Swiss-Prot record:
Glycosylation sites noted in the Swiss-Prot or TrEMBL record: N128, N257, N289
Organism, as annotated: Nesocodon mauritianus
Enzyme nomenclature, EC number: 1.11.1.6
Designated name of the protein: Ferritin-like catalase Nec2
Catalytic activity: 2 H2O2 = O2 + 2 H2O
Signal peptide from the UniProt entry: 1-25
Subunit structure of this chain's protein: Forms homomultimers.
First-tier enzyme category under EC: oxidoreductase
Gene transcribed to yield this protein: NEC2
Task of the protein: Involved in the production of blood-red nectar containing the alkaloid nesocodin and that serves as a visual attractant for pollinator visitation, including vertebrates such as Phelsuma geckos. The nectar is initially acidic and pale yellow, but slowly becomes alkaline before turning into red within 24 hours. Together with NEC1 and NEC3, facilitates the condensation of sinapaldehyde ((E)-3,5-dimethoxy-4-hydroxycinnamaldehyde) and proline to form nesocodin, a pigment with a stable imine bond.
Gene Ontology MF: a single term: catalase activity
Record keyword Glycoprotein present: yes
Keyword entries, A-Z: Glycoprotein, Oxidoreductase, Signal
Tissue spec: Observed in all flowers organs; mainly expressed in nectaries and, to a lower extent, in petals and ovules, as well as in stigmas and calyx at low levels.
Keyword Signal attributed: yes
Length: 311
C-alpha cells in the first residue's frame, strides 16, 4: 500500500514537473520571404509584370480615395516616372470604408514594391480615375443614362461599388497566370499576391452583400442589381462566357445549385474563375478589344504583353 502511495506521489510530481518545464520539439519554419530575383525563371517575367498595370490602378484608386493623394506622395519611386492619374480625388468615406480603403491602399503599395523588386517594373501607365469614366462604365452596365451620373467619390457605398470593379480583375488574372509559371520565387510571389487580392475582393463583396437590398441613392436600383449589371458588363466585354457574378445569383449559379447568395464568385466546383491578359484588357479598356485602349487606360497598359496587343 505504501508502495502504491509513493508511486502515485512520484507520478504526480513528474506530471507537475512536466507542466512547469514543458519539452518542445525543434520547430520547422518556412524561411523568411526575401522576394529577390533568385528562383525567377526568365519566362515568368513578362507574365508577372503584366499585373503591375492592375496594381497601379488599385494603388492609385485606393490611395486617392482614402488619402487624397497617390503614389507620387506615398512612394514616388514606384511610379518610375510614369504620368500621374487624372480625375482621381478624395472620396467622401464613412469611418468603416475609410479604414478598409486605407488598408487596401497601403497593401497595394507593398504589392508594387514586391513585384518591381522581384521581376522588375515599368513606368506607371496613364490612368483615368475620373468620376466620368466610372459613370460611363455604370451607364454601359445599365444600358441607359443615369441622372445624375454615377459618382464613385460621392459616399462610402458608391465607392465600394466602384471598388467592386477593381481587385477582382487582378484576382482572376493571377489565377490564370498561375499554371504557366516555372520559377519557385515567382510562384511564391503570385500566391502571396493572390491571397491578399482575394481577401480584398471578399471584403468588398461581403460589404455589398450585407447591403444587397439597399437602394443606391439617388437611383432606383439596389446594390445587388449594381453588382449583377457590372458583372454582366465585364462578361460581355471579355467575351469568354460567365466568369463574373454579382452578390446575388440564380440558384443554378449558386454553390452546388443550392444558394442564391454569392458572397464569393466561383465556378461550378466553387473554384475561382481565371482570365487571360487579353480578356482582362478587353474589360479594363472598356472597349471589348485588347488592341483598342480606353476606359481606365487611355493610352493602354505598359509592359511587353500589353504593348504587344497595341502593335
Amino acid at each position: 500500500m505504501a508502495f502504491l502511495s509513493n508511486m502515485a506521489m512520484f507520478i504526480t510530481m513528474l506530471m507537475f514537473s512536466s507542466m512547469m518545464h514543458p519539452c518542445f520539439s525543434q520547430p520547422s519554419c518556412a524561411p523568411m520571404d526575401t522576394m529577390d530575383t533568385n528562383g525567377v525563371d526568365e519566362a515568368d517575367i513578362d507574365m508577372m509584370q503584366f499585373p503591375i498595370n492592375l496594381e497601379f490602378l488599385e494603388a492609385e484608386f485606393f490611395l486617392w480615395g482614402a488619402l487624397g493623394h497617390g503614389l507620387d506622395v506615398v512612394a514616388p519611386q514606384l511610379a518610375m516616372g510614369g504620368p500621374p492619374p487624372y480625375g482621381a480625388q478624395k472620396a467622401n468615406l464613412d469611418p468603416l470604408t475609410q479604414n478598409i480603403i486605407t488598408e487596401f491602399a497601403y497593401q497595394e503599395v507593398g504589392h508594387l514594391r514586391a513585384l518591381e523588386r522581384t521581376v522588375g517594373g515599368f513606368p506607371r501607365p496613364l490612368l483615368n480615375l475620373s468620376a466620368s469614366n466610372f459613370a460611363n462604365l455604370i451607364e454601359a452596365a445599365f444600358g441607359y443614362h443615369l441622372v445624375p451620373p454615377f459618382n464613385p467619390y460621392r459616399d462610402g457605398l458608391s465607392y465600394m461599388l466602384a471598388s467592386y470593379a477593381v481587385p477582382y480583375m487582378g484576382l482572376v488574372g493571377y489565377v490564370g497566370t498561375n499554371p504557366n509559371l516555372k520559377g519557385h520565387q515567382t510562384k511564391r510571389l503570385l500566391a502571396g499576391l493572390l491571397g491578399v487580392e482575394s481577401g480584398q475582393d471578399a471584403v468588398i463583396r461581403m460589404y455589398l452583400y450585407e447591403r444587397q437590398g439597399h437602394v443606391v441613392a439617388p437611383y432606383r436600383h439596389t446594390v445587388a442589381e449594381f453588382t449583377a449589371r457590372i458583372s454582366e458588363l465585364r462578361n460581355r466585354l471579355a467575351m469568354c462566357g460567365v466568369k463574373d457574378e454579382g452578390v446575388i445569383v440564380p440558384r443554378q449559379l449558386g454553390a452546388e445549385n443550392q444558394t442564391m447568395s454569392n458572397v464569393l464568385s466561383a465556378n461550378y466546383d466553387s473554384i475561382s474563375y481565371r482570365r487571360t491578359p487579353g480578356e482582362i484588357l478587353r474589360v479594363v479598356y472598356s472597349t471589348g478589344n485588347e488592341s483598342v485602349p480606353g476606359g481606365f487606360y487611355p493610352n493602354g497598359g505598359n509592359g511587353r504583353i500589353a504593348r504587344r496587343f497595341l502593335v
